[in-house]
Amino acid sequence: MEIEALGKKWEINGIDFKPRRKLHAIHSQSYAPAVLNKSNEIDWDKYYDAIEMALSIAFTNPESAVEGLTDAEIDALGQAIIQSYLFIEKKANGGAA
């Protein structure tokens, strides 16, 4: 499976049903406070758990795959992987569809 992120193409592993559902649950929990409290509050621990899980699924050796990237670039790559795995489409304004 191939995605585009950080101005290049990345070859990533596919994702099966069970890990996809777990990733969805963790990713959803990161935004639950914002939805429930009608705020901009994000559970950053859950958000980074989702990023780490996505990177671990996407790459056989995540540390090697992201070598040389900044933390911000790693987060952007992880978010692109999550969007690909969970079929999240971007709106024209940059938010999720």
Protein language model annotation of sequence segments:
Residues 1-10:
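Short acidic-hydrophobic surface loop/beta-edge motif
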Residues 13-97:
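Short, surface-exposed, charged amphipathic helix/loop patches that serve as local interaction elements
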